[in-house]
C-alpha cells in the first residue's frame, strides 16, 4: 500500500513538473530564440495548422554536455561516430500564436548543447489542462556517442542509442528505451515502461528509480556488477545466464552479475522487473 501511494505521488509530481517544463517556464525563462543558426528554421501554415522545422548541425568537443528538457512529444537520440551533432525538430500547433508561444530553443557552445521547450508565461500548465495553446514537438538528435546526455521533463517516448558517456533520464510521461549504456546510467520518475541495456559499466554503476511500468534490464556478457532491487510491486524474473541470485523475496532481489563490481540499483518499481541477457 505504501508503494502504491508513493507511485501515485510520483505520478502527480511528474505531471505537474512535465506541465511546467513543457508549457511554463515562467519568470526563469528570459532567453532569446537561438535556433536561427546555420540556416534557421522553416515555418509553414496549412489548413489552420502551423508547423516549424529546425534542421541544424553543430560541432561538439569530446565529452560535451547535452541537455534536452521541456519537450512535449517524443525524443529520439542516435549515437554516431565523430564530433558532429545534428538537431532535427518538427513542431506543430493549431495556430501560429501557439507555435510561437511554445518554441524549441537550441543553445550551443563547443562544450554544450541545449535543446529545450520555451513558454512565454507562467500559466502554461493551466492552459494545458484546459486543452488549449498546445504545441507538439518531435525531436530527433544525432549525437557523438561520447557526450554526457541528460533528458528531463519529456511528455512522450524517449529512445536513446548506444552511448559511451553518461546517460541520465528523468521526468518522462512515456516509455524509455536506452539501447546501450557504457558509462553511468540513471533513469528516474517514468510513467511508462523502461528498457535499459548495459553493455559495460563504470564505477558509478546504474540506477533506476520511481518507475510506473515494467523495467527490463538487458545485461551484456561482459558486465560485472552487484544487483540490488527493492520496493518492486510486480514479478521479478531472472533470465540472464551470468546472474547468480543470492537473495530473492516478493519485492526485492540481491544478486551478482559476472564476478560482481559496480552497483546496479532499482527502487520503487510498480510493474515488475525482468533481467535478461544480450
Q: Where would I find each of the regions flagged by the language model?
A:
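Short acidic/polar N-terminal linker immediately downstream of export determinants
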Residues: 2-84, 92-99, 125-142, 243-260
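Sensor of tandemly repeated, compositionally biased sequence architecture
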Residues: 34-36, 71, 154, 172, ...
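Right-handed parallel beta-helix
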Residues: 53-61, 65, 74-76, 101-179, ...
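Short strand-connecting beta-turns/loops that link adjacent beta-strands
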Residues: 80-83, 109, 201-202, 222-223
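Long amphipathic alpha-helical scaffold regions
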Residues: 94-99, 179-182, 189-191
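Short, surface-exposed interaction patches in beta-rich subdomains
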Residues: 118, 185-188, 193-278
Amino acid at each position: 500500500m505504501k508503494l502504491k501511494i508513493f507511485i501515485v505521488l510520483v505520478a502527480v509530481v511528474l505531471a505537474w513538473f512535465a506541465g511546467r517544463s513543457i508549457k511554463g517556464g515562467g519568470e526563469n525563462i528570459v532567453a532569446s530564440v537561438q535556433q536561427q543558426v546555420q540556416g534557421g528554421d522553416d515555418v509553414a501554415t496549412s489548413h489552420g495548422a502551423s508547423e516549424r522545422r529546425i534542421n541544424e548541425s553543430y560541432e561538439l568537443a569530446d565529452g560535451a554536455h547535452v541537455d534536452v528538457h521541456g519537450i512535449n512529444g517524443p525524443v529520439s537520440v542516435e549515437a554516431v561516430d565523430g564530433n558532429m551533432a545534428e538537431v532535427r525538430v518538427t513542431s506543430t500547433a493549431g495556430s501560429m500564436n501557439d507555435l510561437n508561444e511554445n518554441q524549441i530553443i537550441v543553445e550551443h557552445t563547443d562544450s554544450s548543447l541545449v535543446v529545450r521547450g520555451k513558454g512565454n508565461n507562467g500559466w502554461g500548465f493551466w492552459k494545458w489542462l484546459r486543452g488549449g495553446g498546445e504545441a507538439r514537438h518531435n525531436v530527433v538528435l544525432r549525437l557523438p556517442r561520447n557526450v554526457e546526455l541528460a533528458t528531463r521533463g519529456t511528455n512522450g517516448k524517449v529512445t536513446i542509442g548506444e552511448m559511451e558517456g553518461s546517460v541520465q533520464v528523468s521526468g518522462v510521461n512515456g516509455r524509455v528505451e536506452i539501447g546501450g549504456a557504457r558509462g553511468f546510467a540513471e533513469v528516474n520518475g517514468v510513467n511508462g515502461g523502461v528498457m535499459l541495456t548495459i553493455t559495460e559499466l563504470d564505477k558509478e554503476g546504474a540506477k533506476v528509480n520511481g518507475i510506473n511500468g515494467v523495467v527490463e534490464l538487458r545485461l551484456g556478457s561482459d558486465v560485472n556488477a552487484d544487483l540490488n532491487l527493492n520496493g518492486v510491486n510486480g514479478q521479478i524474473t531472472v533470465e540472464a545466464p551470468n546472474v547468480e541470485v543470492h537473495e530473492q523475496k516478493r519485492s526485492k532481489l540481491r544478486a551478482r552479475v559476472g564476478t560482481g563490481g559496480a552497483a546496479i540499483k532499482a527502487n520503487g518499481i510498480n510493474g515488475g522487473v525482468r533481467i535478461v541477457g544480450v
